[in-house]
């Protein structure tokens, strides 16, 4: 599937960090950045840009939850890149301090992505406006669309449509619940009520559909696609970057550096932390549930594979 307008965003560090509280080594982050550079990826999301506090410390939650300029510069300066990807960070509503964000012309960051649920759309759009005022490209990522009340989701989409500062509006399959026909249905809803916005798509792999649903989003006209190396991400993970690059057939992309990063860094990392499909996550996706209960069960060695019991409890 070749379409010149398609852009690929690698959120390996940001979504993968949800597994290990962003305690990635600097060497691994450098390797991911190097792979993104050498493969021609358009955007790399290097982590979150949250506000440190007594309860929310970098010692506990990892430095890539806070993305200080000096930490990012250390990564960027580790590898020369002729056409470097845009560097993105993510905001979570109610856990940010916009005053800590430099104007874009003084920062190595180029994009700020704001994640929020439908009830917090006003707060999310305020963060988008303030980010745009500082000169950044912006996205608004509406989480858990599959669990939102449709009338409330429509109202949120109409609000987004009227905010000029939003560059991209994301459909996010937070629970890995979508089938291809739902991807199309939701995207049609987004197009109807936010026709002024360029769309993005972020998939989760609970039902092993992240890649195919991303393909469906492409067919439906989405031009900004989220991926991670080897599918790393919270719970069942995300759409595999390497698979998407193979599918896109765009000569500007070179998938070989991605496979090199997998072999040298992601395969060893799998011995330390878990991601990817299993039947516990498959059940939570099918039931359109937040994966927290599935993740809790997977963390308990005695019951981690008790999918039948998990299903009974989840549906009781």
Where are these regions (language model features)?
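Catalytic cores and adjacent flexible loops of soluble metabolic enzymes
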Residues: 1-316
């Amino acid at each position: 599937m070749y379409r010149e307008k398609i852009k690929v965003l690698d959120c390996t560090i940001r979504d993968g960090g949800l597994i290990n509280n962003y305690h990635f080594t600097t060497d691994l982050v450098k390797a991911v950045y190097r792979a993104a550079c050498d493969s021609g990826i358009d955007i790399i999301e290097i982590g979150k840009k949250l506000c440190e506090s007594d309860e929310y410390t970098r010692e506990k939650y990892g430095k890539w939850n806070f993305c200080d300029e000096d930490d990012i510069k250390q990564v960027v300066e580790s590898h020369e890149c002729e056409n470097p990807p845009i560097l993105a960070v993510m905001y979570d509503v109610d856990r940010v301090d916009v005053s800590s964000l430099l104007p874009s012309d003084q920062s190595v960051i180029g994009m700020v992505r704001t994640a929020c649920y439908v009830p917090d759309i006003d707060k999310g759009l305020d963060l988008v406006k303030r980010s745009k005022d500082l000169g950044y490209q912006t996205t608004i990522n509406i989480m858990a669309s599959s669990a939102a009340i449709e009338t409330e989701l429509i109202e949120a989409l109409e609000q987004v449509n009227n905010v000029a500062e939003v560059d991209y509006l994301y459909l996010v399959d937070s629970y890995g619940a979508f089938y291809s026909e739902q991807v199309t249905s939701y995207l049609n809803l987004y197009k109807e009520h936010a026709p002024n916005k360029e769309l993005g798509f972020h998939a989760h792999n609970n039902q092993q559909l992240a890649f195919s649903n991303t393909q469906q989003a492409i067919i439906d006209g989405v031009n900004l696609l989220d991926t991670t190396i080897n599918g790393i991400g919270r719970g069942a993970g995300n759409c595999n970057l390497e698979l998407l690059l193979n599918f896109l057939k765009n000569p500007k992309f070179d998938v070989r550096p991605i496979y090199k990063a997998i072999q040298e860094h992601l395969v060893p990392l799998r011995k330390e932390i878990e991601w990817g499909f299993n039947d516990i996550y498959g059940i939570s996706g099918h039931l359109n549930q937040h994966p927290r209960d599935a993740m809790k069960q997977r963390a308990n060695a005695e019951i981690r594979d008790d999918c039948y019991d998990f299903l009974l409890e989840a549906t009781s």
